[in-house]
Every structure is written in C-alpha cells, then in structure tokens.
A protein has these predicted regions:
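Short polar catalytic/cofactor-binding loops
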Residues: 7-14
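Catalytic domains of carbohydrate-active enzymes, especially glycoside hydrolases
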Residues: 16-39, 112-116
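Bimodal feature
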Residues: 15-16, 125
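A short glycine/small-residue-enriched secondary-structure motif
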Residues: 37-41, 75-79, 83-84
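Active-site acidic/histidine proton-transfer and metal-coordination neighborhood
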Residues: 64-65, 69-72, 76, 86-173
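Hydrophobic faces of well-ordered beta-strands that scaffold small-molecule active sites
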Residues: 3-7, 31-33, 77-82, 117-119, ...
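Glycine-rich, proline-tolerant flexible connector loops at the mouths of alpha/beta enzymes
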Residues: 32-66, 124-128
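Conserved protein kinase catalytic core
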Residues: 12, 38-40, 85-87, 167-168
Length: 173
C-alpha cells in the first residue's frame, strides 16, 4: 500500500522541489498534485487563469520541475487534482477558459507520468444563484466529453470528485 497526500499547502508555500522533500521526509510515498493551488476560486470566476495553463514556457518549467523533484525525492505523482470550479453559471467565456485549463491539466498529468486526474463535476453550490441538477448534469457531460480526446492522447484516466449536492430550486439534496 502506498500512502499519498495532497501537495497543498507544501508546494504553494515552498515550491515543488522543497515541497516534495518535506512530503517525503514526513513519510509519504506519493502525492495528489493540486493544480487548483495555482488559482483561486475567484480567479476562475474572473477568467484569471494562471500562466501555467496559458504560457508554454511556464508550463514546461512546471513539468520539468515535477519530473525532476519526483525522481530526486522518490515521490510518486499518484494523481493530480484539476482546478476548481470546472463550471460557472452564466459565464460562458469563463467556462471556455476553464475547459482549456482542464485540458492542460490532462496534458501535464500525462507528461509527468501520472495516470489519474481528479476533475470536479459542474457544481454551483450557490443558494444565491441557483441551478438545477439537470443543468449541472448537462454541463458535466459536455465538459467530460470534451476532455476525452486529451485523456486518450495522454493516457490519463479522469476520476470524478465526489461533491456534496443540493438542488437549490427544489431544496432537495
């Protein structure tokens, strides 16, 4: 059995190399690499996608850092965690940008030798701006379907994050 831990808060605070060193020293065999640590929920809502998803040189630097640090410290990148949220109600431009960030997450995951990417379903979770489960279901199906070519190309399996749920309109969980 391998014992793994999320890279938050070590990698955001100390960087990939030092973060992996600390995680290994704490006795872990591997990590769940959090891409969502590179951006906040508000960044995603405002279409402020981090440059690791948009700047080729920075993406390549992250990939190299992840591979080198994994080898150096004997830490397996067991799975990666995609950015959250993966859907924002009534923000089609943000949703297009987020989908591109998810595709880049698949690419990075595959290129560092990780075969599992956890992707959150469409989830509004807002009583202020309610959605129906059927709306979230449809966006999730569209999003996951759009990821299939990238998942196949990079040999990555998409795992669904389990989310709490409530239909804010019907008040049912």
């Amino acid at each position: 059995m391998k014992i793994c831990v999320q890279t938050n808060p070590m990698v955001p605070r100390y960087g990939v190399d030092k973060g992996f060193e600390i995680i290994k020293a704490a006795g872990f065999d591997g990590v769940d690499f959090n891409f969502d640590s590179y951006c906040t929920y508000n960044d995603m809502i405002e279409c402020k996608i981090p440059d690791i998803f948009t700047d080729e040189a920075k993406k390549e630097a992250l990939i190299e850092d992840m591979i080198a640090s994994s080898k150096k410290h004997g830490i397996e990148i067991h799975q990666c965690h995609a950015p959250f949220p993966s859907y924002i109600k009534d923000k089609p431009e943000a949703n297009k940008t987020i989908l591109e960030a998810l595709k880049v997450s698949v690419e990075i995951c595959g290129r560092v030798g990780c075969k599992i990417l956890v992707v959150h379903p469409a989830f509004n979770g807002s009583a202020r701006y309610p959605t129906r489960r059927s709306e979230e279901w449809q966006w999730s199906m569209d999003m996951y379907t759009a990821l299939i070519p990238s998942l196949k190309k990079y040999g990555v399996t998409c795992c669904l994050e389990n989310m709490w749920g409530q239909d804010w309109i019907t008040k049912k969980i």
